[in-house]
């Protein structure tokens, strides 16, 4: 969408957009939903799942995030705007190290347990 000089002046002067322009934007939104054949419930479910997946990797601002359908040049797109607070790469890395250390500890305990079982007792030799 190209911004015209009139749009810029209207924004600077605090003028409300023309009702025809507002109606057109609303119609485009309705058409985008119709073309995608997605119900509002399905779109909301997709939004929640997208947030959950992204939150596994980065800390996001859920309140500031938005998932919407946009149409431009007869093409409908699902657009996710998810403000990132910070990367969780360090947290994920630390968690992976902790799991690895736990696995090593369990493995060591199993080796000790197995070696103790294989040691023969004096009664078994008689």
Curated annotation (Swiss-Prot):
Give the residue ranges for region: Disordered: 92-126
**Biological-process GO terms, alphabetical:** cell division; regulation of division septum assembly
Pfam families assigned to the protein according to its UniProt record, in alphabetical order = MinE (PF03776)
Q: Which domain of life is it from?
A: Bacteria
UniProt entry tagged with the keyword Disulfide bond: no
Show the SUPFAM superfamilies listed in the entry.
Answer: Cell division protein MinE topological specificity domain
Q: In its keyword annotation, does this UniProt entry include Cell division?
A: yes
Classification via InterPro entries: MinE, MinE_sf
Keywords noted in UniProt: Cell cycle, Cell division
Q: Which HAMAP family match?
A: MinE
Functional summary from the UniProt entry: Prevents the cell division inhibition by proteins MinC and MinD at internal division sites while permitting inhibition at polar sites. This ensures cell division at the proper site by restricting the formation of a division septum at the midpoint of the long axis of the cell.
Q: Report the sequence similarity comment from the record.
A: Belongs to the MinE family.
- The protein's name is Cell division topological specificity factor
